[in-house]
A protein has these predicted regions:
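Bacterial N-terminal signal peptides that target proteins for export
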Residues: 1-9
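Sequence contexts marking disulfide-bonded cysteines in secreted/extracellular proteins
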Residues: 38-42, 71-73, 89-91, 127-129
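Conserved long hydrophobic alpha-helices within structured protein cores
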Residues: 23-36, 80-86
Length: 138
């Protein structure tokens, strides 16, 4: 009987651990750049890339990858090794993004890197700020 209780408790703990890890925030969410200089908060073209795979707009999931004049709605996420392949529709202007007009299909490959780095389409990016460190209004 004691063995059954121990097995039951171990099983319950394993289930809770699996559920907790499956809800962990994606390592890709946040503000990234290819250099520390590009992490500065300034307007204009640079390598800053904002990734929010849990983004919600008007109560609906709306994951996005946002770069200077390149606003991408994530249509599909496919696991690939230690990363993801994102099938996206990208727009040059926010107005087009909001209207869903003049989009182009783009595939974006994300891969985890060493501490606070990722690779976006093979290029190394460093973490500027985690998503929860950024202002809510973007």
């Amino acid at each position: 009987m004691r063995k059954v209780v121990v097995i039951t408790i171990a099983s319950v703990l394993a289930i809770f651990a699996a559920q907790t890890s499956s809800h962990a925030a994606p390592v890709f969410d946040g503000l990234w750049a290819t250099s520390k200089k590009d992490c500065r908060d300034k307007d204009g073209p640079d390598s800053k890339t904002f990734i929010d795979l849990d983004n919600v707009i008007k109560g609906k999931p709306a994951p996005l990858v946002d770069q200077y004049e390149n606003h991408c709605r994530v249509d599909r996420k496919t696991p690939a090794g230690d990363g993801l392949v994102l099938s996206t529709t990208c727009f040059e202007f926010w107005d087009d993004y909001n209207k869903g007009a003049n989009g182009r299909k783009v595939t974006i490959k994300l891969a985890a890197g060493p501490k606070d780095t990722i690779r976006i389409d093979g290029n190394s990016y460093r973490l500027c700020k985690r998503k929860d460190e950024l202002p809510r209004k973007r």
